């Protein structure tokens, strides 16, 4: 079958690896956010926050080094996962990652213009036609 899939057979394991790294970015970004916002300042753990931040930034730089794997003509689940992880990181933490990752930064600027990404922003309603 020539039907397109979100999980391409030829790149299945590369795709799953990229998804796992994106999931790790999200987990660390959420943990960092919880530590910074839900825990009283005098009980926060600076070393834990630093570990979360380092894991996030190292993972994003790893993706930048594998950038060519994200540049396929059809939309794949690894692209969606990475875009969501980068967008959330920018929203809740920092966009400083973009300084060392110009390819990912430019790619994210393009992918976030797509309707499916715009429609999932907080507070946005989208009509499907």
Predicted feature residues:
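All-alpha amphipathic helical-bundle segments outside canonical DNA-binding/catalytic cores
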Residues: 8-14, 68-79
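Short, hydrophobic secondary-structure boundary micro-motifs
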Residues: 4-8, 42, 72, 118-123
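GST superfamily/GST-like fold recognition
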Residues: 73-94
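Carbohydrate-binding/catalytic loop surfaces
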Residues: 125-129
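GST-like domain detector, emphasizing the conserved glutathione-binding G-site
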Residues: 1-46
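Short helix-capping/linker segments at secondary-structure and domain boundaries
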Residues: 27, 36-38, 89-99
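C-terminal end-helix/capping segment
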Residues: 99-122
């Amino acid at each position: 079958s020539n039907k397109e899939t979100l999980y391409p057979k030829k790149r299945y394991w590369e795709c799953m690896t990229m998804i796992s790294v994106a999931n790790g970015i999200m987990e660390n970004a959420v943990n960092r956010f919880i530590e910074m916002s839900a825990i009283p300042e005098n009980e926060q753990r600076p070393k834990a926050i630093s570990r979360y931040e380092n894991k996030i930034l190292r993972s994003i730089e790893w993706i930048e080094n594998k950038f060519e794997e994200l540049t396929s003509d059809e939309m794949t689940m690894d692209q969606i996962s990475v875009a969501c992880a980068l967008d959330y990181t920018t929203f809740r933490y920092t966009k400083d990652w973009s300084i060392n990752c110009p390819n990912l930064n430019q790619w994210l600027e393009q992918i976030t213009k797509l309707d499916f990404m715009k429609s999932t922003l907080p507070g946005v309603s989208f009509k499907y036609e």
